[in-house]
Amino acid sequence: MSKSTIKFVRLSPTKTRLIAKEIQGMNAEFALATLEFTPNRGAKYIANAILSAVANGGFEPNEVIVKSCRVDAGPVLKRFRPRARGTASRIRKPTSHIMVEVSKPSKEA
């Protein structure tokens, strides 16, 4: 089993979790092919995390499965935008931490 972590990615964790749930349990090679054609910004970062986890373990993408893919919330950058009558509204810019674990499939008889 090998792990990979990408921290402080400027993505919403809520939106990125949708992709992470889809690829959990998939073969790593199939997951990478799926992510390549997923029209979401988070797919690129998750694909990089999978490639990194595969390389960390010294595996090939076709011989491992994505055991777990977790997206946690990081710190939120807070910015302000001027509004009418001298007021200001807060803009939240969320960040994410992406954790991926890959391992060889277990031999089930």
UniProtKB/Swiss-Prot annotation:
The keyword Ribonucleoprotein applies. One of its GO terms (cellular component) is cytosolic large ribosomal subunit. The keyword Oxidoreductase does not apply. GO terms for molecular function: rRNA binding; structural constituent of ribosome. Gene3D superfamilies: Ribosomal protein L22/L17. Residues 84-95 have a biased composition (Basic residues). It comes from the Bacteria. Keywords: Ribonucleoprotein, Ribosomal protein, RNA-binding, rRNA-binding. Residues 84-109 are annotated as: Disordered. CDD domains: Ribosomal_L22. Belongs to the universal ribosomal protein uL22 family. This protein binds specifically to 23S rRNA; its binding is stimulated by other ribosomal proteins, e.g. L4, L17, and L20. It is important during the early stages of 50S assembly. It makes multiple contacts with different domains of the 23S rRNA in the assembled 50S subunit and ribosome. This is Large ribosomal subunit protein uL22.
